[in-house]
From Swiss-Prot:
<keyword id="KW-0479">Metal-binding</keyword>
<comment type="function">
    <text>Snake venom zinc metalloproteinase that impairs hemostasis in the envenomed animal.</text>
</comment>
<keyword id="KW-1199">Hemostasis impairing toxin</keyword>
<comment type="similarity">
    <text>Belongs to the venom metalloproteinase (M12B) family.</text>
</comment>
<keyword id="KW-0800">Toxin</keyword>
<keyword id="KW-0862">Zinc</keyword>
<keyword id="KW-0482">Metalloprotease</keyword>
<dbReference type="GO" id="GO:0046872">
    <property type="term" value="F:metal ion binding"/>
</dbReference>
<keyword id="KW-0645">Protease</keyword>
<keyword id="KW-0964">Secreted</keyword>
<feature type="binding site">
    <location>
        <position position="9"/>
    </location>
    <ligand>
        <name>Ca(2+)</name>
    </ligand>
</feature>
<dbReference type="GO" id="GO:0006508">
    <property type="term" value="P:proteolysis"/>
</dbReference>
<dbReference type="GO" id="GO:0005576">
    <property type="term" value="C:extracellular region"/>
</dbReference>
<dbReference type="GO" id="GO:0090729">
    <property type="term" value="F:toxin activity"/>
</dbReference>
<protein>
    <recommendedName>
        <fullName>Snake venom metalloproteinase bothrolysin</fullName>
        <ecNumber>3.4.24.50</ecNumber>
    </recommendedName>
</protein>
<keyword id="KW-0106">Calcium</keyword>
<keyword id="KW-0378">Hydrolase</keyword>
Amino acid sequence: TPEHQRYIELFLVVDSGMFMKYNGNSDKI
């Protein structure tokens, strides 16, 4: 369903953002 696809895309965006933030903090340390 379109709603399910939208939810997956949102999850991927959030997951990617958290991953980049984690990498930034790790690299900073």
